[in-house]
Amino acid sequence: MRWQGRRESDNVEDRRNSSGGPSMGGPGFRLPSGKGGLILLIVVLVAGYYGVDLTGLMTGQPVSQQQSTRSISPNEDEAAKFTSVILATTEDTWGQQFEKMGKTYQQPKLVMYRGMTRTGCGAGQSIMGPFYCPADGTVYIDLSFYDDMKDKLGADGDFAQGYVIAHEVGHHVQKLLGIEPKVRQLQQNATQAEVNRLSVRMELQADCFAGVWGHSMQQQGVLETGDLEEALNAAQAIGDDRLQQQSQGRVVPDSFTHGTSQQRYSWFKRGFDSGDPAQCNTFGKSI
């Protein structure tokens, strides 16, 4: 991506040298040992990546809530600047899209942190991956997740990283359009299988919205050769079917909450090819 020199967002808060603080409360996270711990790590990491708050899984003995202060490396500075630029591009993209709808886009906040931080949805921890909190309209990210994408998920490249931010912003768009609260209401009295199916549709729509952002980047000449493949690879790398096969050796479709690799690929591509949020209605057609 040709992102250097572009506008940075004014909606970024940097907490990387701040303590989580005693007001966060609650227990810390202790990963179980053995295969169960590995499975839980993958589940929480990927759920956080797609905006699902799994803080309730964080049980065990309390851990220190104090983050040590250390210097920020040049690579981390570069990642922070990149993240701020990407957020700014989503602001421009959705500002234009909402104007076409006759609406005003309310920009989300983004918080960069290390380890753990307070959020409107409870304690945020880096083990959760990036996530969006609808209660405070904020995207949270520990920038070390970019390394996790490369080393643990096999999804490398700046456009793949931008896709992460654009997906979380997609959840913010769902909130503004009234989609997220309606889905949460439907899930309250639904069976677990139906809760999961609704979650899949939410996540695929956020993928499609990320594709709409990607289309805007292409139209502006920001993308370089290979960028689209980076994002599509990221979408495929974290499909429920692939992750379940890797972590437990079998696939359980009724337990899917994010969609298959092919579904993620297809819905991102739909948004990317059309540039039209109206093409992202995952609730009105077969997925």
UniProtKB/Swiss-Prot annotation:
It comes from the Bacteria. The chain crosses the membrane at residues 38-60. One of its GO terms (cellular component) is membrane. Its main location: membrane. Residues 1-17 have a biased composition (Basic and acidic residues). It holds the Pfam family Zn_peptidase. It is found in: Membrane. Residues 1-29 are annotated as: Disordered. The keyword Transmembrane applies. InterPro entries: Uncharacterised_pept_Zn_put (IPR007343). Keywords: Membrane, Transmembrane, Transmembrane helix. PANTHER family: INNER MEMBRANE PROTEIN, PUTATIVE MEMBRANE PROTEIN YPFJ. This is Uncharacterized protein YpfJ. It comes from Escherichia coli (strain K12). The gene is ypfJ.
